[in-house]
Amino acid sequence: MRKDETMEAAAKPLSLKEWVSRGSRVLMGNVTREELVFRKGRGSWLYTTEGDGYLDFLGGVAIHVLGHCHPKVTVAVQKQAQRLLHTSNLYYHEPQILLAEFLVRETFADRVFFANSGTEVVEAAIKLARRFGAAAERFDLLGLEGSFHGRTLGALSLTGQKKIREGIGPIPEGFSWAPYNDFEGVVRKVSPRTAAIFVEPVLGEGGGDSGRSGLPEKTSDLHPGQGDSSCLRRDSDGDCPYGIAFCLSGL
């Protein structure tokens, strides 16, 4: 945007069509966007540049569990922004340690890895699983049909949706998929080269399926070879789906 256009936008309200037109010229078309331009959010409501209110059932793709601009969250962000915004992961800082201690205390975890996105977490889990299996030359990873793990190359390769993987050429080797509600099908796919099985305890994009066959529980106990592991990924349908902090805690 040129400087004069920026000043013009600040001085004169733009119409919805004008904002959409300008956005479509400069933003990548990696997703299909609705022709809505939001200016603010309060609680469960989003408000457009033209003042129309929309009840938000999407929640930032199921992450705004406290709603928009929750007063306590807003104050906490403001206070931290006045103290410290970023140091890198080469140092400790107080909120980082306090949050990690809380997560270890309240969940199944022994240690915490903080990341910027879900796909980054999956990439780290892929590397960890292969590192874990390296001594026995076990590098294969088994995903489940209908799953979604992210759009970076490793996470995309693990995703069990053909349409997501189309158009990018050959994916890295070592990835395969089994039906979600078929434990015997999972067992048939496991081989001596399997390093890990990736399971969404609640299949998000696959229809909110929580495993009618008890697949997540059974898979977490599956150890066909010495040192096999399961990677259980938190679903993207929001936390506390079963009234506990993480559905993984019940597995």
Regions found by a protein language model. Give the residues of each.
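Hydrophobic "anchor" residues on beta-strands that sit immediately upstream
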Residues: 52, 196, 228-230
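PLP-dependent aminotransferase-class I/II
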Residues: 146-203, 207-215
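Active-site-adjacent loop/helix segments that line or gate small-molecule/cofactor pockets in enzymes
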Residues: 2-42
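Surface-exposed amphipathic alpha-helices with a cationic face
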Residues: 130, 216-226
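Glycine-rich loop-to-alpha-helix module at the N-terminal edge of alpha/beta enzyme cores
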Residues: 53-138, 142
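A glycine- and small-aliphatic-rich helix-loop capping segment at beta-alpha/alpha-beta transitions
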Residues: 130-135, 157-165, 214-215, 245-251
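Active-site and channel-lining beta-strand-loop segments
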Residues: 35-58
